[in-house]
C-alpha cells in the first residue's frame, strides 16, 4: 500500500526490471527480486558482509579504528550500516575526540559498554538525541551513518540497475525518517562518478510498515496454495 511507503525519489518504473531491497537493523540485509510473469523470484544475498568502502578521510579513519577494535583486516559494511554500526561510529568519534561528548549521553553509553546483559539500546539513544539536535556528537554520528547507508544502497543499485525500485527496509530507516529525507542519503546514493546519472530514474522508497516481513510471508503462503 502507498501508506506503507515514503518515496525519496519517484523515478520512472520500467517493467520487467529488478527490484532491490536493503535494510539496516540488527545487521544489514540485501536482496533482489526478478520479475517472472505475474510474480517475482526472490534472491537473498550476504551483501551486508561485503567490504566497507570509505569515501573520505574521516571514513578512512573510521575503517582503521574498526580494524583495531575488532582486530581484523576485513570490515564489512554491516559493521557500519546497522544498529551496532551507529554505536561504533559514536565510539569512534568519541575516542578520537572529534567533538565533545555530553555527560548525559556519555554516561548512558558507558553504562551500556559495561553491562554484561544489555538493558540499554544505545543506537536509539544516539539517534533520538540527533533527531532532537540536542547533542553534536550524536548528530555527527548519524550524519556518517546516513551517508554510509546511502552509499551502500547506491552500490547495490549500480550492480543491479533496479528500475523496478529500491526499497529501504529494516528497523532503522523509518525511525529516522527526517534524517533520511534531508538529502544526505540520496546524495551519497547517487555519488557514483561517471555513472551516477544512471540512478536518477530509479524509484527509491522507504518501507514504513514494521510488519512487512510478516505480510510478505502471508502473501507467499497464499501463492503456494494457488
What are these regions (language model features)?
Residues 61-226:
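ATP-binding/phosphotransfer module of carbohydrate and carboxylate kinases, centering on a glycine-rich
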Residues 1-94, 217-220, 224-225:
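Phosphate-binding/catalytic loop of phosphoryl-transfer enzymes
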Amino acid at each position: 500500500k502507498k501508506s506503507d511507503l515514503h518515496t525519496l525519489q519517484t523515478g520512472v518504473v520500467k517493467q520487467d526490471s529488478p527490484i532491490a531491497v536493503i535494510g539496516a537493523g540488527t545487521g544489514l540485509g540485501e536482496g533482489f527480486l526478478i520479475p517472472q510473469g505475474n510474480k517475482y523470484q526472490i534472491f537473498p544475498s550476504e551483501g551486508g558482509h561485503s567490504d566497507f568502502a570509505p569515501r573520505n578521510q574521516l571514513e578512512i579513519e573510521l575503517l582503521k579504528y574498526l580494524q583495531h577494535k575488532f582486530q581484523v583486516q576485513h570490515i564489512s559494511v554491516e559493521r557500519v550500516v546497522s544498529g551496532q554500526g551507529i554505536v561504533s561510529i559514536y565510539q569512534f568519534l568519541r575516542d578520537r575526540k572529534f567533538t565533545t561528548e555530553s555527560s548525559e549521553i556519555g554516561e548512558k553509553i558507558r553504562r551500556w559498554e559495561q553491562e554484561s546483559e544489555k538493558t540499554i539500546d544505545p543506537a536509539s539513544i544516539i539517534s533520538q538525541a540527533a533527531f532532537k539536535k540536542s547533542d553534536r556528537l550524536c548528530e555527527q554520528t548519524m550524519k556518517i551513518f546516513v551517508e554510509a547507508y546511502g552509499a551502500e544502497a547506491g552500490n547495490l543499485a549500480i550492480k543491479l540497475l533496479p528500475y523496478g525500485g529500491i526499497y529501504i527496509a529494516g528497523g532503522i530507516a523509518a525511525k529516522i525518517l527526517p534524517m533520511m529525507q534531508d538529502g544526505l542519503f540520496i546524495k551519497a546514493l547517487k555519488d557514483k562518478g561517471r555513472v551516477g546519472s544512471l540512478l536518477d530514474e530509479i524509484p527509491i522508497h522507504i518501507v514504513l510498515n514494521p510488519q512487512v516481513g510478516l505480510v510478505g510471508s502471508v502473501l507467499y503462503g497464499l501463492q503456494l496454495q494457488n
